[in-house]
Amino acid sequence: MAKTKQTLTQLALLVGLTATGLATFTAQADKLAHIKAKAVVKVATFDANPPFGSVDAKTHELVGYDVDFAKALAKSLGVKLELVATNPANRIPLLQSGKADLIVADITITPARAQVIDFSTPYFVTGQQFLVPASGGDKLDDYSKARIGAVKGTTGEQTLHQRFPQARVLSYDDIPLALTALRNGNVQAITQDSTILAGLLGEAPDKAKFKILPELLSKEEIGVGVKKGEPALLKAVNDELVALEKSGDAAKIYDAWFGPSTKAPQPRSFTIEAK
């Protein structure tokens, strides 16, 4: 009898642990259902990183490229959007702690980060580009033996030596000094991250004299961050990103923040593709 009771107790304990495990698994793996039940999605985004995310001086609301994508994702899920302001260091902790359901904050997809969180298909692609005189060649290879300015100690400087070993790479302390060298004819091109070059050119009084080549010397893909173990939510995000591309809305969002009429214009050199 004692043995029977012991067996029943063990079975009850096993059933209890199994039920607890299933409940935990369901809670962890059903974030999409939780979002829809709460009718709100919490999205971590920047509040001081234009044009991706910043506070509008007039409305005091968050605006930007990332914000527009966050709005589109919320609309596709049929829920309200709650923006959670963040900085680079806090993006992943906010997601892991449950204070944010998604990261839409200019976060580059890297192998190290992919071990911690899942990423959507890229919705923005950036990388190292060339700023050259308006009359210069339109391809990177046109500058394979040129004098090229780069910022000292950057990965861009290293990439130039690898890609164009016959080029003469001149290093500068910052990108404004490199632009001055380009203006003076000391170099035939300068290189830096595409968004930085776009901002630099946008503020230049003589911007008509220069152009940014659309081809990327290096490539960095930006994706939406999703907590590990949420395949349904990840699929919903990917499906909407691809739908935005097919409808043309993704290109419209891009043009609103990086198009010809913006302060930091740069050509769109990518499309959002199914993962």
Which residue ranges define each predicted feature?
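Extracytoplasmic small-molecule ligand-binding "clamshell" domains
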Residues: 31-106
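Flexible hinge/capping segments at coil-to-helix
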Residues: 32, 132-148
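Ligand-binding cleft/hinge of the Venus flytrap
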Residues: 53-57, 70-79, 156-173, 201-205
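Short helix-initiation/N-cap motifs at beta->coil->alpha
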Residues: 67, 82-93, 135, 152, ...
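Extended ligand-binding regions for polar small-molecule ligands
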Residues: 67-76, 136, 146-147, 154-155, ...
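Short helices/loops that flank or line small-molecule/ion binding pockets
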Residues: 75-76, 84-85, 89-102, 116-118, ...
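Periplasmic-binding protein-like
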Residues: 124-131, 194, 198-238, 260-275
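Ligand-binding clefts/hinges and TM-proximal coupling segments of bilobed small-molecule sensing domains
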Residues: 159-172, 241-275
